[in-house]
């Protein structure tokens, strides 16, 4: 379905690290003209053209989504939810709202930072309201996406290969570990 979208809002995802396969698909979509906006916390280079971007503290994701929802409601001539009556939208929120309002096939995608935030339910509720108001769908970019993608791509031990647990249980002479912080990235439960 991603290939048919013309507007996408990605919230709380370090796309290249957390969801590299999705990042590639979004990169291709952007090349075809899909307008992609982001609300993120890292300010990293997504290696794709963004229509609008708000880089905020993780604690400000919900507030930023509230600003987008208010701007979108005003753009669409819809009623602003009473709970958000005092919310003022900044220029970036208005730019994101304008993009979403102009789309026919819209998706709001929540990444790892958004779904793991202490206020994840508020973030999800606001994102769902934005998706509904823009006539789109809400989606979740889950933490296991890389694992599933790697499996589907065949990046698993072949004949005679060993899993990470087997390599630790039966030590090898050498290990090559790239782009990993073993103490931070590996759950040895």
Put a short name on every predicted segment.
Residues 1-189:
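Cofactor-pocket helix-loop regions in the catalytic cores of large enzyme subunits
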């Amino acid at each position: 379905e991603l290939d048919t979208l013309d507007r996408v809002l990605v919230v709380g995802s370090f796309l290249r690290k957390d969801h590299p396969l999705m990042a590639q698909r979004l990169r291709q979509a952007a090349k075809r003209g899909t307008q992609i906006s982001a609300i993120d916390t890292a300010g990293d280079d997504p290696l794709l053209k963004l229509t609008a971007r708000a880089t905020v503290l993780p604690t400000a994701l919900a507030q930023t989504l509230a600003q987008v929802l208010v701007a979108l409601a005003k753009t669409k001539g819809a009623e602003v939810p009473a709970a958000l009556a005092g919310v003022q939208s900044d220029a970036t929120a208005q730019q994101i709202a304008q993009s979403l309002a102009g789309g026919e096939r819209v998706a709001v995608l929540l990444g790892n930072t958004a779904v793991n935030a202490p206020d994840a339910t508020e973030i999800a509720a606001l994102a769902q309201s934005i998706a509904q108001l823009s006539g789109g769908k809400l989606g979740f970019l889950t933490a296991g996406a890389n694992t599933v993608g790697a499996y589907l791509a065949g990046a698993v031990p072949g004949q005679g290969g060993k899993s990470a647990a087997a390599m630790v249980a039966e030590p090898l002479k050498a290990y090559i570990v790239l782009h990993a912080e073993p103490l931070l990235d590996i759950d040895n439960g």
